[in-house]
Regions:
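Short functional micro-motifs and their immediate structural scaffolds
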Residues: 23-29, 33-36, 77-84, 260, ...
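Iron-sulfur-cluster electron-transfer modules
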Residues: 8, 12, 39, 45-208, ...
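Cysteine-cluster motifs in flexible loop/terminal segments that predominantly coordinate metals
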Residues: 18-25, 72-75, 292-300
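Cofactor-cradling patches in redox/metallo enzymes
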Residues: 82, 143-231, 256-370
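Long terminal accessory regions outside catalytic cores
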Residues: 1-37, 50, 54
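Hydrophobic alpha-helical positions that pack around
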Residues: 251
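Acyltransferase donor/substrate-recognition loop-hinge adjacent to the catalytic core
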Residues: 237-248
Length: 370
């Protein structure tokens, strides 16, 4: 535990460098919903400057204000002063926890350590797929495994249809999400995943979750993994899909896949192969609005998170008139499906899920024609 907040040169410079221009207000999904200044990056930088200068005390209110951020990185990309507010927020969250301001994610950290997933589920899924040696190993992540099971089943089915020689493991949470909310990644869980993955003899790890992808690529806990890491869109982009969808299709860029990982083109390459009526929303690629699920925000403020997703759905429908919304992130998928209302006449899938359904439809049509 630390005794006081740390104001090193990097953090001090970031806080002072904020010019208070307010550009971040136009791209912050939480401010867009609440209109409260403290919820955008400028508001947080002003708050932290007051604390740094001793004008405001370190308090529970400061800790709670720091949780009102999805770490979507939109403010960072739109900051003319070159400040990275979401990185400041994440590092400040750790310091606040270190000072004893445990937030509601303390319980999640304990659950992850005890059960190996963020939901406290006691039983692991049996997906009915082989576990053993293979060139590729598929890693699903907590949200897909425990909250979007049907999407995962379709992804597995798609890989089987494409004759991919892959295996699966008894995975546990990568635990990277704990880093976002002020706690530390569980090294023992990382080691368990590494051991299980290396047993397969695989040369490539394919992950369906952009956040897991980032953890495997970026976090020192996984430096000994020794595999080529690919998000599933990177893996699938060169396949020749023999299916088409005639409905108007659009795509939402997940923050973790897009702004954080820089993966924009691969999902679109896949979509354009199967969807001739593909149309982009107005705010897309690095300018896409967040769905409200990231940075622990859905866990801390679930009602507001769903409202943000609902706002994003309305934007997309108004911009595109699409009949099908695709993404490739289990958290985005889960939040959008929870937010969808009757007025949203929109099918929502992960790309892999749609592809599997298209193949299933083609097989059905062939049977009917026979």
């Amino acid at each position: 535990m630390i005794n006081t907040l740390q104001w090193d040169e990097k953090r001090r410079k970031a806080i002072i460098q904020c010019s208070r221009c307010g550009f971040c207000r136009a791209v912050c999904p939480i401010f867009d919903l609440t209109k409260r200044p403290i919820t955008n990056a400028r508001g947080k930088m002003i708050l932290l400057k007051e604390v740094m200068e001793g004008k405001l005390p370190v308090s529970e209110a400061v800790a709670q204000a720091l949780l009102r951020c999805t770490t979507c990185m939109n403010c960072t990309l739109n900051c003319p002063s070159g400040v990275d507010p979401q990185e400041v927020v994440k590092s400040m969250r750790k310091d606040m926890v270190g000072l004893g301001y445990d937030n509601l994610f303390k319980a999640m950290a304990e659950v992850v350590e005890k059960y190996g997933n963020i939901y406290g589920e006691e039983k692991q899924h049996d997906w009915g797929h082989k576990k053993g040696k293979a060139p590729y190993v598929l890693f699903l992540g907590c949200v897909g495994t425990y909250r979007e099971e049907e999407s995962v089943k379709e992804t597995i089915r798609l890989l089987d249809l494409l004759n991919v020689d892959f295996t699966m493991i008894d995975e546990v949470c990568c635990s990277g999400v704990l880093e976002d909310v002020g706690y530390k990644i569980k090294a023992e869980l990382a080691q368990q995943n590494i051991r299980e993955i290396q047993k397969t003899g695989a040369k490539t790890l394919i992950t369906t979750c952009p956040y897991c992808y980032r953890v495997f690529i970026e976090h020192p806990a996984y430096k000994d993994l020794g595999l080529d890491i690919k998000h599933i869109t990177q893996f699938l982009k060169d396949f020749d899909f023999q299916v088409k969808i005639e409905k108007k299709v659009t795509y939402h860029d997940p923050c973790d896949l897009g702004r954080h990982a820089g993966i924009y083109d691969e999902p679109r390459e896949i979509i354009r192969k199967v969807a001739p009526k593909f149309v982009e929303p107005r705010r897309t690629r690095e300018n896409a609005m967040c769905c409200g699920a990231g940075g622990g925000f859905r866990g801390a403020y679930p009602k507001e998170s769903v409202k943000i997703a609902r706002n994003r759905l309305s934007q997309i429908i108004e911009d595109t008139g699409a009949e099908v919304l695709l993404t490739e992130c289990p958290s985005c998928l889960h939040n959008f499906r929870n937010a969808r209302q009757r007025k949203h006449h929109l099918e929502i899938y992960n790309i892999t899920e749609l592809l599997a359904r298209l193949y299933e439809g083609r097989a059905t049509n062939k049977k009917e024609a026979a």
